């Protein structure tokens, strides 16, 4: 916080005192209104910026203070799916190249035939036709673009995926399809999700555990059943009351 003549009068933390763990194959949701710090937590875990205190552990290894060269192979084990599938995909690249680029960068394919097979397998996993790899991102619907983004996140076989409002930009009818896909992939590959959302109706469908943030701090945490059936904090109760047709 800046004071008179540019002096520092204090520090404001975007998030503070947050601690959690996510078991293999489970989903933890961070929920709260815009600006509460939930996306900041996801970015901190992904090491998109450095934290000023605390620790981030991935599969038992501390990564928050890890040098960039050491961190690179660890990045294979954590991926992200962003809110807006269109802005997260390069509009100048065909889908084949969007998926092939990280496969090449990580040296995952033995040869060109193996590369093509891997790209095709990814399309199968997200239930898109293989022959669509020659198309551009703008030729797909929003839900299809998000499937492509999910396919890209699967390339390195991560143990953790940070899903930052992954369906909030989609029509309600498409949201359910994408959420079902995420849950099916979780069952198949044992994925852990950090699911960032402001939509508690979606969270109730998707998540095992819930952490409610307000002004960068946790106000309530528990299993999804505990939160949705017996919320204790007034802020959580307000969020739940905003769900159309909500009842315990």
PLM segments and residue spans:
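ABC transporter nucleotide-binding domains
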Residues: 1-245
């Amino acid at each position: 916080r800046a004071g008179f003549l540019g002096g520092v009068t204090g520090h404001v933390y975007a998030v503070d005192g947050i601690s959690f763990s996510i078991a293999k194959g489970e989903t933890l949701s961070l929920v709260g209104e815009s600006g509460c710090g939930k996306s900041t937590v996801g970015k901190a875990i992904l090491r998109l910026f450095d934290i000023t205190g605390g620790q981030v552990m991935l599969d038992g290894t501390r990564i928050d203070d890890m040098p960039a060269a050491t961190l690179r192979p660890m990045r294979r084990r954590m991926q992200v799916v962003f809110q807006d599938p269109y802005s997260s995909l390069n509009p100048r690249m065909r889908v084949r190249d969007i998926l092939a680029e990280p496969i090449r960068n990580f040296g995952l394919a033995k040869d060109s035939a193996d590369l093509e097979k891997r790209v095709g397998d990814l399309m199968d996993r997200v239930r898109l036709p293989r022959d669509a790899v020659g198309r551009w991102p703008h030729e797909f619907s929003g839900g299809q673009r998000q499937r492509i983004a999910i396919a890209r996140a699967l390339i390195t076989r991560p143990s953790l995926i940070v899903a930052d409002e992954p369906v909030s930009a989609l029509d309600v009818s498409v949201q359910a399809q994408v959420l079902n896909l995420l849950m099916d992939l979780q069952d198949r590959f044992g994925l852990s999700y950090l699911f960032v959302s402001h939509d508690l109706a979606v969270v109730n469908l998707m998540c095992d555990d819930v952490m409610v943030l307000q002004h960068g701090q946790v106000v309530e945490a528990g299993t999804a059943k505990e939160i949705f059936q017996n919320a204790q904090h007034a802020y959580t109760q307000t969020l739940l009351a905003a769900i159309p047709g909500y009842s315990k």
